[in-house]
Protein backbone atom coordinates (compact mmCIF):
# COMPACT_ATOMS: atom_id res chain seq x y z
CA UNK A 1 0.00 0.00 0.00
CA UNK A 2 1.22 3.48 -0.90
CA UNK A 3 1.81 5.81 2.07
CA UNK A 4 1.06 8.99 0.09
CA UNK A 5 -1.96 11.09 1.06
CA UNK A 6 -5.05 10.65 -1.07
CA UNK A 7 -7.00 13.71 -2.26
CA UNK A 8 -10.46 14.09 -0.77
CA UNK A 9 -12.05 13.65 -4.20
CA UNK A 10 -10.59 10.15 -4.50
CA UNK A 11 -12.01 9.19 -1.12
CA UNK A 12 -15.42 10.47 -2.22
CA UNK A 13 -15.19 8.26 -5.32
CA UNK A 14 -14.41 5.28 -3.07
CA UNK A 15 -17.38 6.10 -0.82
CA UNK A 16 -19.78 6.57 -3.74
CA UNK A 17 -18.76 3.26 -5.32
CA UNK A 18 -19.21 1.48 -2.01
CA UNK A 19 -22.67 2.98 -1.45
CA UNK A 20 -24.04 2.66 -4.99
CA UNK A 21 -22.29 -0.48 -6.24
CA UNK A 22 -22.19 0.99 -9.74
CA UNK A 23 -19.68 3.19 -11.53
CA UNK A 24 -22.46 4.91 -13.47
CA UNK A 25 -24.56 5.66 -10.39
CA UNK A 26 -21.49 6.80 -8.43
CA UNK A 27 -20.46 9.17 -11.23
CA UNK A 28 -23.99 10.59 -11.39
CA UNK A 29 -24.08 11.09 -7.61
CA UNK A 30 -20.78 12.96 -7.73
CA UNK A 31 -21.71 14.94 -10.88
CA UNK A 32 -18.52 13.81 -12.60
CA UNK A 33 -17.87 12.15 -15.98
CA UNK A 34 -17.63 8.37 -15.73
CA UNK A 35 -14.21 8.27 -17.47
CA UNK A 36 -12.86 10.56 -14.73
CA UNK A 37 -14.31 8.29 -12.05
CA UNK A 38 -12.76 5.26 -13.74
CA UNK A 39 -9.38 6.99 -13.87
CA UNK A 40 -9.55 7.89 -10.17
CA UNK A 41 -10.61 4.33 -9.31
CA UNK A 42 -7.51 3.07 -11.11
CA UNK A 43 -5.40 5.44 -9.00
CA UNK A 44 -7.14 4.18 -5.84
CA UNK A 45 -6.36 0.59 -6.82
CA UNK A 46 -2.72 1.49 -7.32
CA UNK A 47 -2.62 3.31 -3.99
CA UNK A 48 -4.14 0.41 -2.03
CA UNK A 49 -2.54 -2.30 -4.20
CA UNK A 50 -5.96 -3.94 -4.27
CA UNK A 51 -8.82 -4.18 -6.81
CA UNK A 52 -11.14 -2.59 -4.18
CA UNK A 53 -14.30 -3.11 -6.27
CA UNK A 54 -14.90 -6.13 -8.49
CA UNK A 55 -17.56 -6.29 -11.19
CA UNK A 56 -20.13 -9.04 -10.53
CA UNK A 57 -23.63 -9.84 -11.79
CA UNK A 58 -25.11 -7.71 -8.99
CA UNK A 59 -22.78 -4.75 -9.55
CA UNK A 60 -19.45 -3.52 -8.19
CA UNK A 61 -18.75 -5.55 -5.06
CA UNK A 62 -16.12 -4.40 -2.51
CA UNK A 63 -13.12 -6.56 -1.74
CA UNK A 64 -12.48 -7.44 1.93
CA UNK A 65 -9.97 -4.58 2.17
CA UNK A 66 -12.47 -2.11 0.70
CA UNK A 67 -15.19 -3.35 3.07
CA UNK A 68 -12.89 -2.77 6.06
CA UNK A 69 -11.80 0.68 4.86
CA UNK A 70 -15.27 1.91 3.88
CA UNK A 71 -16.56 2.89 7.37
CA UNK A 72 -13.38 4.86 8.13
CA UNK A 73 -13.46 6.67 4.78
CA UNK A 74 -17.15 7.49 5.29
CA UNK A 75 -16.31 8.89 8.73
CA UNK A 76 -13.56 11.13 7.30
CA UNK A 77 -15.93 12.47 4.65
CA UNK A 78 -18.59 13.12 7.30
CA UNK A 79 -16.08 15.08 9.40
CA UNK A 80 -15.19 17.17 6.36
CA UNK A 81 -18.83 17.87 5.56
CA UNK A 82 -19.77 18.68 9.13
CA UNK A 83 -16.82 20.78 10.23
CA UNK A 84 -14.65 21.87 7.32
CA UNK A 85 -17.16 22.50 4.56
CA UNK A 86 -19.50 24.30 6.95
CA UNK A 87 -16.71 26.83 7.53
CA UNK A 88 -16.53 27.44 3.79
CA UNK A 89 -20.12 28.69 3.75
CA UNK A 90 -21.64 31.82 5.18
CA UNK A 91 -25.31 31.98 6.11
CA UNK A 92 -26.17 35.54 7.17
CA UNK A 93 -29.47 34.32 8.59
CA UNK A 94 -27.77 32.20 11.25
CA UNK A 95 -24.24 33.63 11.52
CA UNK A 96 -23.19 35.56 14.63
CA UNK A 97 -19.94 36.74 13.06
CA UNK A 98 -18.59 40.13 14.15
CA UNK A 99 -17.29 42.10 11.16
CA UNK A 100 -14.79 44.90 11.77
CA UNK A 101 -14.96 47.85 9.38
CA UNK A 102 -12.24 50.51 9.47
CA UNK A 103 -13.40 54.00 8.47
CA UNK A 104 -13.12 57.61 9.54
CA UNK A 105 -15.79 59.01 11.83
CA UNK A 106 -17.51 60.41 8.72
CA UNK A 107 -17.23 57.05 6.96
CA UNK A 108 -18.76 55.22 9.90
CA UNK A 109 -21.58 57.77 10.14
CA UNK A 110 -22.23 57.35 6.42
CA UNK A 111 -22.12 53.57 6.28
CA UNK A 112 -23.33 52.08 9.56
CA UNK A 113 -26.88 53.50 9.52
CA UNK A 114 -27.27 52.17 5.99
CA UNK A 115 -26.13 48.71 7.06
CA UNK A 116 -28.75 48.55 9.79
CA UNK A 117 -31.72 47.69 7.57
CA UNK A 118 -29.86 44.85 5.84
CA UNK A 119 -28.72 43.41 9.15
CA UNK A 120 -32.23 43.57 10.58
CA UNK A 121 -33.80 41.91 7.56
CA UNK A 122 -31.27 39.26 6.56
CA UNK A 123 -28.59 38.95 9.25
CA UNK A 124 -30.20 39.42 12.67
CA UNK A 125 -27.27 38.01 14.66
CA UNK A 126 -24.42 39.51 12.65
CA UNK A 127 -22.59 42.34 14.43
CA UNK A 128 -20.48 45.15 13.01
CA UNK A 129 -17.71 46.96 14.88
CA UNK A 130 -16.58 50.30 13.48
CA UNK A 131 -12.93 51.12 14.16
CA UNK A 132 -10.92 54.25 13.45
CA UNK A 133 -9.12 54.33 10.13
CA UNK A 134 -5.34 54.42 10.58
CA UNK A 135 -3.17 54.14 7.50
CA UNK A 136 -0.03 52.98 9.30
CA UNK A 137 -1.18 49.53 10.41
CA UNK A 138 -4.13 49.31 8.00
CA UNK A 139 -2.49 46.98 5.49
CA UNK A 140 -1.24 44.71 8.26
CA UNK A 141 -4.68 44.66 9.91
CA UNK A 142 -6.37 43.78 6.61
CA UNK A 143 -3.80 41.06 5.97
CA UNK A 144 -4.15 39.56 9.44
CA UNK A 145 -7.94 39.65 9.29
CA UNK A 146 -8.28 41.86 12.36
CA UNK A 147 -10.00 44.30 9.96
CA UNK A 148 -12.40 42.80 7.41
CA UNK A 149 -13.09 45.86 5.26
CA UNK A 150 -11.66 49.38 5.10
CA UNK A 151 -13.75 52.23 3.73
CA UNK A 152 -12.27 55.50 2.53
CA UNK A 153 -10.23 57.35 -0.07
CA UNK A 154 -6.66 56.10 -0.23
CA UNK A 155 -5.02 56.76 -3.62
CA UNK A 156 -2.66 53.81 -3.26
CA UNK A 157 -2.16 50.92 -0.88
CA UNK A 158 0.43 48.18 -1.07
CA UNK A 159 0.23 45.06 -3.19
CA UNK A 160 -2.19 42.46 -1.92
CA UNK A 161 -4.99 44.95 -1.24
CA UNK A 162 -8.04 44.67 -3.48
CA UNK A 163 -10.46 47.55 -4.01
CA UNK A 164 -13.91 48.40 -5.30
CA UNK A 165 -14.95 51.96 -6.10
CA UNK A 166 -18.26 52.89 -4.47
CA UNK A 167 -18.76 56.56 -5.34
CA UNK A 168 -16.98 59.85 -6.05
CA UNK A 169 -17.20 62.60 -3.45
CA UNK A 170 -16.81 66.36 -3.93
CA UNK A 171 -15.99 69.02 -1.33
CA UNK A 172 -18.26 71.89 -0.28
CA UNK A 173 -18.26 74.60 2.40
CA UNK A 174 -20.67 74.64 5.32
CA UNK A 175 -21.42 77.37 7.84
CA UNK A 176 -24.11 78.03 10.37
CA UNK A 177 -27.27 79.74 9.17
CA UNK A 178 -26.48 82.98 11.01
CA UNK A 179 -22.95 83.26 9.59
CA UNK A 180 -22.18 86.84 8.38
CA UNK A 181 -20.82 85.54 5.07
CA UNK A 182 -24.32 84.50 4.06
CA UNK A 183 -25.22 88.18 3.80
CA UNK A 184 -22.27 89.23 1.65
CA UNK A 185 -21.62 86.11 -0.43
CA UNK A 186 -18.58 83.85 -0.49
CA UNK A 187 -16.12 84.69 -3.22
CA UNK A 188 -12.45 83.77 -2.97
CA UNK A 189 -11.41 86.91 -1.09
CA UNK A 190 -14.25 86.60 1.42
CA UNK A 191 -13.37 82.93 1.83
CA UNK A 192 -9.78 83.85 2.74
CA UNK A 193 -10.89 86.50 5.23
CA UNK A 194 -13.34 84.28 7.11
CA UNK A 195 -12.44 82.13 10.09
CA UNK A 196 -11.98 78.44 9.33
CA UNK A 197 -11.86 75.05 10.97
CA UNK A 198 -9.75 72.43 9.19
CA UNK A 199 -9.91 68.67 9.54
CA UNK A 200 -6.38 67.30 9.49
CA UNK A 201 -5.46 64.22 7.48
CA UNK A 202 -4.57 61.96 10.38
CA UNK A 203 -4.97 59.05 7.94
CA UNK A 204 -1.62 59.34 6.15
CA UNK A 205 -1.84 59.28 2.34
CA UNK A 206 -5.61 59.78 2.41
CA UNK A 207 -6.94 62.03 -0.37
CA UNK A 208 -8.14 64.48 2.28
CA UNK A 209 -4.47 65.24 2.93
CA UNK A 210 -4.39 66.98 -0.48
CA UNK A 211 -7.43 69.07 0.45
CA UNK A 212 -5.87 70.02 3.77
CA UNK A 213 -2.63 71.04 2.03
CA UNK A 214 -4.50 73.19 -0.49
CA UNK A 215 -6.41 75.01 2.26
CA UNK A 216 -3.27 75.59 4.32
CA UNK A 217 -1.57 76.99 1.23
CA UNK A 218 -4.44 79.35 0.43
CA UNK A 219 -5.64 80.58 3.81
CA UNK A 220 -3.75 83.09 5.99
CA UNK A 221 -2.55 81.33 9.15
CA UNK A 222 -4.52 83.73 11.35
CA UNK A 223 -7.78 82.71 9.63
CA UNK A 224 -7.49 79.11 10.83
CA UNK A 225 -9.21 79.22 14.20
CA UNK A 226 -9.44 75.46 14.87
CA UNK A 227 -7.99 72.21 13.60
CA UNK A 228 -9.37 68.80 14.54
CA UNK A 229 -8.97 65.19 13.46
CA UNK A 230 -12.70 64.58 13.43
CA UNK A 231 -15.24 65.50 10.75
CA UNK A 232 -18.28 65.22 12.99
CA UNK A 233 -16.77 67.29 15.80
CA UNK A 234 -15.76 69.93 13.26
CA UNK A 235 -19.31 70.09 11.91
CA UNK A 236 -20.71 70.54 15.41
CA UNK A 237 -18.26 73.39 16.02
CA UNK A 238 -19.33 74.99 12.73
CA UNK A 239 -22.94 74.84 13.91
CA UNK A 240 -22.05 76.79 17.05
CA UNK A 241 -19.48 79.34 15.80
CA UNK A 242 -18.74 81.65 12.88
CA UNK A 243 -16.23 79.35 11.19
CA UNK A 244 -16.32 77.84 7.73
CA UNK A 245 -15.76 74.12 7.35
CA UNK A 246 -14.74 72.44 4.08
CA UNK A 247 -15.98 68.85 4.05
CA UNK A 248 -17.28 66.10 1.75
CA UNK A 249 -20.70 66.89 0.30
CA UNK A 250 -22.51 63.87 1.75
CA UNK A 251 -21.54 64.84 5.27
CA UNK A 252 -22.55 68.42 4.52
CA UNK A 253 -26.00 67.30 3.36
CA UNK A 254 -26.30 65.08 6.42
CA UNK A 255 -25.93 68.12 8.70
CA UNK A 256 -27.87 70.49 6.44
CA UNK A 257 -30.87 68.15 6.54
CA UNK A 258 -30.89 68.54 10.30
CA UNK A 259 -31.19 72.29 9.91
CA UNK A 260 -27.90 73.33 11.48
CA UNK A 261 -25.68 74.16 8.52
CA UNK A 262 -25.93 75.87 5.15
CA UNK A 263 -24.00 74.57 2.13
CA UNK A 264 -21.97 76.77 -0.22
CA UNK A 265 -19.72 75.84 -3.17
CA UNK A 266 -16.00 76.03 -2.44
CA UNK A 267 -14.59 79.08 -4.29
CA UNK A 268 -11.41 77.16 -5.20
CA UNK A 269 -10.75 73.93 -7.07
CA UNK A 270 -10.20 70.97 -4.78
CA UNK A 271 -9.55 67.30 -5.60
CA UNK A 272 -12.49 64.95 -5.36
CA UNK A 273 -12.39 61.68 -3.44
CA UNK A 274 -12.89 58.29 -5.04
CA UNK A 275 -14.33 56.39 -2.09
CA UNK A 276 -13.62 52.66 -2.14
CA UNK A 277 -13.85 49.57 0.00
CA UNK A 278 -10.59 47.71 0.59
CA UNK A 279 -9.85 44.11 1.58
CA UNK A 280 -6.85 41.81 1.49
CA UNK A 281 -6.48 39.20 -1.24
CA UNK A 282 -6.20 36.50 1.45
CA UNK A 283 -9.91 36.98 2.12
CA UNK A 284 -11.03 37.57 -1.45
CA UNK A 285 -12.83 34.20 -1.52
CA UNK A 286 -13.94 34.20 2.12
CA UNK A 287 -17.75 33.75 1.96
CA UNK A 288 -18.43 36.15 4.83
CA UNK A 289 -16.16 38.82 3.39
CA UNK A 290 -17.78 38.39 -0.02
CA UNK A 291 -21.24 38.80 1.54
CA UNK A 292 -20.22 41.97 3.38
CA UNK A 293 -18.63 43.50 0.27
CA UNK A 294 -21.77 42.83 -1.74
CA UNK A 295 -23.96 44.38 0.95
CA UNK A 296 -21.77 47.49 1.09
CA UNK A 297 -21.73 47.78 -2.72
CA UNK A 298 -25.54 47.75 -2.81
CA UNK A 299 -25.94 50.47 -0.19
CA UNK A 300 -27.51 53.64 -1.55
CA UNK A 301 -24.80 56.22 -0.85
CA UNK A 302 -26.41 58.91 -2.98
CA UNK A 303 -28.81 60.12 -0.30
CA UNK A 304 -28.56 60.59 3.45
CA UNK A 305 -29.73 57.61 5.52
CA UNK A 306 -33.35 57.61 6.57
CA UNK A 307 -34.15 59.38 9.81
Swiss-Prot record:
Annotated Gene3D superfamilies: Periplasmic binding protein-like II, Winged helix-like DNA-binding domain superfamily/Winged helix DNA-binding domain
CDD domains: PBP2_DntR_NahR_LinR_like
HTH lysR-type domain residues: 6-63
UniProt entry keywords in alphabetical sequence: Activator, Aromatic hydrocarbons catabolism, DNA-binding, Transcription, Transcription regulation
DNA-binding residues (ranges): 23-42
Alphabetized GO MF terms: DNA binding; DNA-binding transcription factor activity
Family: Belongs to the LysR transcriptional regulatory family.
Protein role: Transcriptional activator for the pcpA, pcpB and pcpE genes for pentachlorophenol (PCP) degradation. Essential for PCP degradation.
Keyword Transcription regulation among record annotations: yes
SUPFAM superfamilies hit by this protein: Periplasmic binding protein-like II, Winged helix' DNA-binding domain
Descriptive protein name: PCP degradation transcriptional activation protein
Pfam families: HTH_1, LysR_substrate
Example GO biological process: catabolic process
Taxonomic superkingdom: Bacteria
PROSITE patterns: HTH_LYSR
The keyword DNA-binding is assigned to this record: yes
